[in-house]
């Protein structure tokens, strides 16, 4: 690897570190009406540090949530549902329909694309 290539790679890594900070807001699916078909994505506020999926019969709720409030009593009271199953998770878009872990998030693309471009430039 040439000196020029090393400098380019270091600059790219620095830019990635600047743009990819761990304190950036979490992204979750959010549905105004309880529905299994939800494609609306929202950036959570700083005090909402988890994504919630709650299912009560045919109704499916997806939204930003506080992880410390992720318990049956709080969720059922807030959603006014007596019977439900719920899951709270802390990764971007982890509350999507049938999450199989293969979705690429914007942050993943931000990390991978510049590295692939740098590797391509170094090989040419």
UniProtKB/Swiss-Prot annotation:
The entry's keywords: Cell membrane, Disulfide bond, Glycoprotein, GPI-anchor, Lipoprotein, Membrane, Secreted, Signal
Residues linked to a lipid group, GPI-anchor amidated glycine type: 101
Gene Ontology terms: cellular component: plasma membrane; side of membrane
Post-translational modification: N- and O-glycosylated.
Membrane topology value: Lipid-anchor; GPI-anchor
Propeptide part(s) removed at maturation, as residue ranges: 102-124
GO biological process, one term: negative regulation of activation of membrane attack complex
Stretch forming the signal peptide: 1-24
Residues with attached carbohydrate: 37
Start and end residues of each UPAR/Ly6 domain: 25-101
Source species, domain of life: Eukaryota
GO molecular function: complement binding
Compartments, record wording: Cell membrane; Secreted
Cystine connections: 28-51, 31-38, 44-64, 70-88, 89-94
Task performed by this protein: Potent inhibitor of the complement membrane attack complex (MAC) action, which protects self-cells from damage during complement activation. Acts by binding to the beta-haipins of C8 (C8A and C8B) components of the assembling MAC, forming an intermolecular beta-sheet that prevents incorporation of the multiple copies of C9 required for complete formation of the osmolytic pore.
Subunit text: Interacts with T-cell surface antigen CD2.
Protein name: CD59 glycoprotein
Species for this entry: Oryctolagus cuniculus
